[in-house]
Regions:
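Flanking helices and flexible, charged tails adjoining ferredoxin-like Fe-S electron-transfer domains
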Residues: 193, 363-371, 381, 387, ...
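Short beta-alpha connecting loops at secondary-structure transitions
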Residues: 254-260, 304-305, 413-420, 618-623
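SH3/SH3-like beta-barrel fold
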Residues: 569-571
């Protein structure tokens, strides 16, 4: 299919872009000590530029030390400028154009700051300090020009400082920058725009990121006010508006990094309504993962350009594959947000990752060819085993995948049974097709035994046999009636009825609850000894409250099931007096979703050890965990063969 609109050129001031695709600024966490740029961040951007992206926007850069969170780059001195030059050089060498997102975070939570920095106690900005910040935006713009960027973006969305000035409930001021009028609320942003323009060449475009809708705050900027501001911003020197959605002060956070719960293009009606009333190009943001949708939105005049973010994290060749009619080869984002968001807020994570692309942020390593091609036995055709085989083949090895069941897919097929998660099933089926396309044999219906390993004599073995259900040790559970396993429910082998209790509030338990609601079971309670939504990730947990408000799905946290009787459970919890109390609760159906346990693998690893065959155990076969851990293990194992 041809996507002529998507891949048509567009000119912003003096900059001509070869297509309408923008890689938006996204936090990668690849910043080093002293704001240094290593080899990883330039390689990350070079991969997307070489993949055909029209404009790469480098993530948030802080304009001053006071707002410099350790997660982000800075751009307020010449050292920063010289470090960022590494990124622009890499993008240009790969045939792309480079933009940078210039930022002041405003009310940034304390936990985002490096504790070694001594930060002043937050206080009301004086007018003098506001003027200094305006100048600092201008100086960052000057440094960005010197660093070789082709375009600049002023970040004014997501309750960062510019948004805080514009929003009538966040702006508490009573002076000329206060909330008495729209002109006052917009004054700071317009001053920043003019100051940045003064420090930029006449032919260099200035973009601005805004929210297409201000929401879930005590008071909001209306659409009429947003349109008025955009028109003022255009007069002040903004050449295109990048319309996003979401804020860090409410449940609207979910719109900033939209998970699979939101439909692709969920923000486009808001954007189109604004575009119809402004006279500068509009960049549309809103979980666009399909080139056909992106092209359609541009053809229909709803947007002029499209931000393709997470889709290009999952596949840096998204643009080239789309343009060349190879859409079926695109490794698609599934909207899990486990790597691109959860790893951002995980202090242990060194950088973002991706379930579908475990090489994300590791592009600089390439795919080194081995001195000798090895015959590798991959045991298990789930998400981990298939991914390992793909990377092995790409490097030049000869993998063969063995699967005990009659079809590939593993637990990712079941994961796709929950509402709005079809992309998970599609992803693992894509992996199976990709293996076939690459010439990798998948032998189904074959259980690998130590004897088979001895017979085949592979050079290397990767065990990816996954995990299986093991019933929890609860008195009475083994004899109770109307007890089901979540795995069987999702597979369609069983359907609970009536008043249903789900034991286990992790991802499987919560998604089973969603599955049951979708299939007409109206009385569902999820119980967990810790919290409901455990290990689901922050954004997907938030969607439990958004999509299933109130008592739609009842939630009981801190509840430990101590016994199961005749359609009755006994559970213990700690009351407000901090005393342990036991109670009983009736059920018509009880669903066990307490998690999985790794399948036994010692017979396989022992056989490999006896034969002197190197062996790696990966994913849930090593430790029952999330899909993102399985694919990360798969990549690491494949790279080490």
């Amino acid at each position: 299919m041809s996507y002529d609109a998507l891949f048509s050129p567009i000119k912003l001031r003096g900059l001509e872009l070869k297509n309408r695709v923008v890689l938006p600024g996204m936090n990668t966490k690849m910043v080093k000590d002293k704001n240094d740029v290593g080899e990883d961040l330039p390689a990350y951007h070079a991969a997307r530029a070489a993949g055909g992206c029209g404009l790469n926007i480098v993530e948030l850069v802080s304009i001053c030390p006071e707002c410099h969170a350790y997660l982000y780059l800075g751009l307020y001195n010449e050292h920063h400028r010289d470090q960022l030059r590494k990124i622009t050089d890499a993008i240009h060498a790969a045939g792309g154009k480079a933009g940078v997102q210039i930022w002041h975070g405003g009310f940034v939570p304390e936990e985002f700051f490096d504790k070694t920095n001594k930060l002043e106690t937050p206080d009301t900005l004086t007018v003098e300090r506001i003027h200094e910040i305006v100048k600092q935006f201008g100086y960052s713009a000057k440094l960005a020009v010197e660093a070789g960027f082709d375009a600049l973006e002023f970040h004014g969305a997501h309750t960062y400082l510019p948004h805080e000035f514009m929003n009538p409930s966040l702006n508490k001021r009573t002076d000329e920058y206060g909330n008495q009028s729209l002109e006052n609320r917009c004054r700071f942003n317009l001053e920043v725009i003019r100051e940045m323009r003064k420090n930029m060449p006449e032919d260099m475009p200035l973009l601005m990121r805004l929210d297409a809708i201000d929401e879930m705050l005590p008071a909001v900027t209306t659409q009429d006010e947003t349109v008025q501001f955009i028109n003022w911003a255009a007069e002040a020197g903004v050449d295109a508006i990048d319309l996003s959605r979401g804020n860090a002060r409410s449940l609207a956070t979910v719109y900033e990094v939209p998970p699979y719960n939101l439909e692709p293009g969920f923000n486009m009606d808001n954007i189109a309504a604004i575009k119809a009333r402004v006279n500068i190009p509009v960049i549309g943001v809103g979980r666009i993962v399909d080139p056909a949708l992106a092209d359609q939105l541009i053809r229909e005049g709803k947007i002029d350009m499209v931000a393709v973010g997470r889709a290009q994290l999952a596949d840096p060749e998204w643009c080239n594959k789309s343009k060349e009619g190879r859409e079926a080869e695109i490794r698609r984002c599934i909207g899990c947000t486990e790597g691109c968001y959860d790893k951002v807020i995980d202090p242990k994570a060194k950088h973002i990752t991706c379930t579908r692309n475990p090489a994300l942020c590791l592009e600089y390593k390439g795919l080194p060819k081995p001195e000798t091609a090895k015959n590798v036995m991959v045991i298990g055709a789930g998400i981990g085993g298939l991914m390992a085989a793909e990377y092995l083949k790409a490097r030049g090895h000869n993998p063969t995948v063995y699967e005990a069941t009659d079809a590939p897919g593993g637990h990712f097929v079941l994961a796709g049974k929950a509402p709005k998660k079809q992309a998970f099933t599609d992803a693992v089926m894509w992996d199976a097709e990709e293996c076939k396309r690459m010439g990798i044999e998948i032998k189904t219906g074959v259980t690998v035994t130590p004897e088979l390993i001895k017979e085949v004599k592979p050079d290397h073995v990767i065990v990816a046999t996954g995990a299986h259900f093991v019933a929890p040790n609860i008195p009475g559970l083994d004899t109770a009636k109307d007890v089901y396993v979540a795995e069987d429910v999702l597979a369609g082998k069983a359907m609970p009825h009536g008043e249903t209790i789900i034991l286990g509030g992790g991802g499987v338990g919560c998604e089973t609850a969603q599955f049951l609601i979708a299939h007409g079971v109206t009385d569902v309670r999820v119980m967990d000894s810790k919290r409901v939504g455990n290990k689901m990730g922050m954004l997907r947990t938030m969607f439990l409250d958004i999509e299933y408000p109130g008592e739609t799905i009842k939630k009981s946290r801190g509840s430990k099931i101590t016994a199961v009787g005749d359609h009755e459970i006994t559970y213990a919890f700690t009351n407000k007096a901090k005393k342990t109390v036991e109670k009983t609760r009736h059920f018509d159906s009880l669903v066990i979703a307490t998690g999985m346990h790794s399948r036994p693998t010692q017979d396989l690893t022992d056989a490999c050890s006896e034969l002197g065959i190197p062996c790696d155990v990966i994913g849930s076969a090593k430790k029952a965990d999330m899909g993102i851990e399985a694919t990360a293990d798969a990549y690491a194992a494949a790279m080490n063969v």
